[in-house]
């Protein structure tokens, strides 16, 4: 009965939305993005992420004990005995420039973030310490428990994409930053547990600066699509200096965490750089417009809605979780028919024109540390 009531409330809300509605990032009806599993967005910053992936597996966003992001403690807390990563066990990064040939590097608006991907064999990598003596139970996060004199080997972590969040997802001693970049790496060698792929993420924070634009961000920010589910090929000869986006001071905090978006899978090794890079006010505003809120109008004719007696302006993804309405017990069949009709009428994203009208955001709230090991690496 409660579910039926929720459907009726949603129906009333949707019906009350006349020719123009405001949609948060990830819910725009003109989106060309395709998704598997249950739909999600950042409207509640992850507090409502309960659902399943495309294979029917439940997300662990609300049940996991090692979730990301976190509030990184003060330096003096991490400088205590046993809370440092020894120099010989610290992660090393090597990122040559990304170079576009006109179609090999793409800036993507996927409805959740602005993401950069490439289609060629990029030579960049990070190397992560692991125990020299291993067994099938060893994991990518074992470096957190290694002692300074432990015999070690290294695995190679290959970057597969990077993307942004605003505001920052990680906090440094409670401080929030305007932007955070995540470089996602995949590890497939040496560790038995990683044959299917293990992941490590490097987080880079950005702080506002009164100076000019950060030229390292410009090749990306100058090519950000604003329509969800679309991408831009960087022009031929365009270079992204990924290595220079890493701070010159490579101090970092590392811990075991998760993806910061559904399904929120755990077992990732996180590195959060403690020295922020800079971003101008103008660049921050441009990013927030790229993930901004949209006012959308239907371009369909009134006749298409004549049978309903009023105009509809809906988003099919808003109704994604009601795909099986025939299973909903109801005192009346009207909610079923109403929502089925809405879904049928809103399958065409080109039936809408959308304009950005407000800054947006795409961050997840900080999660409880739950007693996890968090270590500081002082880069020397």
Swiss-Prot record:
Transmembrane segments: none annotated. Disulfide bonds join 61-264, 194-198, 296-354. Residues 38-322 form the Alpha-carbonic anhydrase domain. Glycans are attached at residues 101, 135, 297. The keyword Electron transport does not apply. SMART domains: Carb_anhydrase. Gene3D superfamilies: Alpha carbonic anhydrase. Keywords: Disulfide bond, Glycoprotein, Lyase, Metal-binding, Periplasm, Signal, Zinc. It catalyses: hydrogencarbonate + H(+) = CO2 + H2O. Residues 1-20 form the signal peptide. Its main location: periplasm. It is found in: Periplasm. The active site is at residue 112. Belongs to the alpha-carbonic anhydrase family. Reversible hydration of carbon dioxide. This is Carbonic anhydrase 2. It comes from Chlamydomonas reinhardtii. The gene is CAH2.
